[in-house]
Amino acid sequence: VILLSKNNSFIKGAAILSIAGIIVKILGAIYRIPLANIIKDEGMGYYQTAYPFYVLLLTISTSGFPVAIAKLVSEKRALGDHRSAYRVFKVALTGLTIGGLLSSLFVLFMAEDIVRSIDNINAYYSLVALVPALFFVPIMAAFRGFFQGRKNMVPTALSQIGEQFLRVVVGLSLTYYLLDRGIPVAAGGASFGGSAGAILGTVIIFIIFLLHKESIEREVRQTRIQTDYSVGEIIKDLLTIAVPITIGAAIIPTMDTIDAGLVIRRLQSIGYSKETANELYGQLKGFAQTLINLPQVFSVAIGMSLVPAIADANARRNKREIRQIIGSGIRMTLLIGLPCVFGLFVLAKPIINLLYFKNTIETINSSGEILAYLSFGVIFLTLVQALTAMLQGLGKPLIPVINLFIGALLKIILTYILTAIPGINIKGAAISTVVAYATAAILDLILLSKVAKIKFNYRDIFIKPLISALGMAIIVRFSYGFLLKIIGGRLSTILSIGIGGLAYVILLIVTGTITEEDIKFIPKGERLGRYLDKFKLLK
């Protein structure tokens, strides 16, 4: 078992971003669940058709740069070169502002052609409404990368919360207001919430930057190291890191963009109408995929903290610290991801019924089946995110790109084949997604162990969390069946989730998966640790 220092900035950063992520996901649930109940699977189909293309453009213009900025800033600061660290940020901010302007203008003038190319003209309003976000998100990304490189995760956390809050308020308000004008227009109102949130998130992090600017510039003035880190060198270093990451990050939204057209067309090829195919796609992306994305709040937070932490240790050539961080990151990812997999699988239909109860029984049953298949993708998706961050921090960004590309190719092939089989239909897209992430995660893990020269403690990192999660799933299944007979309905689902969470924590302690050192990291952890140790519950 890897012991973690209380002063470990990686853990602290991950905790801050996880808390922010939980708040963001709660707000997201407040947004997506009533949204799906308002515009139904038809509207979610339009919304989700536009969204992957928007994410693709944002990925191209921003995804690799926050990581590149964080890595370079962290490395320069580790060497005491604050002047170069600040120069990296200023050059990146200029480039991202230009990139955001170009991508927003591209969508503004090409929106109609884009939606026609994927044979869904009703998604036009949903796409155009996201144009302002395409400009502001890259700017926000530059500031977030800079603060993350300084190992200050608070500005990112606050801007995330502000961004999501306004997205919810504006998105739901416009959806209600525009509903009388038709589902396509209402879906466009929902999309505009993303633009409103991006503007507020940018404003928040810019204000925080202004508050820190004096101390940042003081650091620069006090820097004794004199280096000629030119603009050309900065651009070269940024692109060297960012381009492979951007290519890798673009694979998933590209995959989703292809899905938007491929899935609907393949469903039509076996007799589904365009409307029904769109509704099934809405169930996949708007209902099931939304729930699959919830555990990512933790893996994304872990990943964002891993890059600067590993880059810092790598710059100091501290191999032991690198191995400790990697082991901790994988273990944390599995501890969170595994119970989500089995919980979503066991309670797939009850959870869909709990959240999307205003939809028809047919929609709830169909979405539940999709979620059951898709649930197994949670652990592989969260692992891919964490392992990708580790390889990026080690200066090997191309490895996860190649592995994810292999997975994406498998997904496209399997989606094409499986979705056109009548007995499988839309579930084929879910199965292919799981296979894609499983392939990428396994390849990442194998190559990471070689790059970092690390031998994993499989019993503590993999086996113990798996046993605890399986035990939890069995308890949840029997609890739900028992409660359903007594109280029925959605309350039994809520209580079963609570019982499952409690059972998982107990099983983690009983199996020795959670140690006394781990307990110390939670509030009042030392007192709790002594209490549990008194009853011989900690190992």
Which sequence ranges carry the predicted segments?
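Interfacial/gating helices of multi-pass transporter permease domains
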Residues: 36-56, 183, 187-188, 236-241, ...
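Interfacial segments at transmembrane-helix termini and the short loops linking adjacent helices
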Residues: 112-129, 345-378
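Signature of the first transmembrane helix
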Residues: 9-67, 97, 104, 108, ...
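Membrane-proximal transmembrane or re-entrant/amphipathic helices at the cytosolic face
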Residues: 478-539
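Helix-loop junctions and terminal segments of transmembrane helices
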Residues: 63-78, 296-319, 326
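Membrane-interface helix-loop junctions in multi-pass transport and translocation proteins
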Residues: 154, 165-203, 208, 398, ...
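N-terminal membrane topogenesis motif
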Residues: 1-27, 83, 87, 225-252, ...
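Membrane-interface junctions at transmembrane-helix termini in multi-pass inner-membrane proteins
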Residues: 137-159, 376-406
